[in-house]
Amino acid sequence: MINRKKNFLSLYVHWPYCESKCPYCDFNSHVIEDVDKDAWTKSYTNQLYEYKSFLDRFDVKYDNLSTIFFGGGTPSLMPLKILDHILDISSKIFKFKDDIEISLEANPSSYEREKFRQMHKLGINRISIGVQSLNDKNLQFLGRKHNYRDAETAIDLATNTFNNVSIDLIYALYEQNIDDWENELQSVLNKFNINHLSAYQLTIERGTRFFKDFKKGLLKAIDNDLAAEFFTRTKTILNEHNFQRYEISNFAKEKFESKHNLNYWNSENWIGIGPGAYGRMWSSNQDNKRVEIKNYKNPKTWLNKNSQNSEFENINIFNQYESDIDTLIMGLRLSKGIEIEKLIDKSIIQKKKFKELEEENLIIIENGKIKINDDHLIKLNSILSYLIN
């Protein structure tokens, strides 16, 4: 049995609302004109107190809160009063580490740009801007509400307000060629003083408008060879600008990796409040197995269940094998891989599936670690699916 020391503790806050639904998005996001601010504030508060009781109940070993991440949806649309209240209550319940990272996702619309300075005053110290593209034609294809000028202004304002700025970009779009993508990426890196960049290949997810178009033959996915070339060139260009890949789609300058996401991938403790959010933690009184707590996904259902008291949809205690698979699936996303010492049953890597992957040179097991071979990173999802199933 692993004698776990105190793990980090992170908080994820989900705000499910957006101005519009993007055609590629399969996240738990919805369009609504107005919300009951008091009910939402009360529900978030109830969940924070309920999580504290669960951490005590499962004897979860953790230090003070190390990160908070406001995601969505579009959390920069969250009323500032709710944002301020969540930060205030969570600091009282869990206490903040001195170097706590507090991140918030934002879109480059004019309304949200005006809130950057106010958010910074409330305690947000890291901003992640959903730029997605600096090409107006691509932005229109992606169903985004902003244009290139909006994005440029938002990034400039963010870098003048926050010391830690990340942007998201989507590449390998339908009919996009590699030269255009390289020029766009080079432009971003040469023009803006950002510390972190998330670069995602466009995927056609079930339940999205793009998926419907794909089924109708109106949209095509790029072939695997071209996708691999996009991926390789992206890594090369970012490395040339001193951005190191630390996770499959995430690149950062030294010391600017997302602490919050690293807590996920390193299988630390985290709690999640809001519709569809979930938490995972190590329980000392459950033989150090992983405990998962899930919230109701539908915003109306979640609000009804939490505005008076707090109610989670499901609490699941992983068995030993599930705990180890969860640790592996999260950790194998990291460029450094995962330490075998973190596994409850270290003999799991002797099982047939792992031996097959190692023989095919898809994974590397050495120096007490397991990692995906860099030459096969593009196959990560297939490798993880194989391990899960």
Feature names for model-found ranges:
Residues 1-11, 58-62:
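N-terminal [4Fe-4S]-dependent radical SAM core
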Residues 375-389:
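Short, amphipathic alpha-helical interaction segments positioned at domain boundaries
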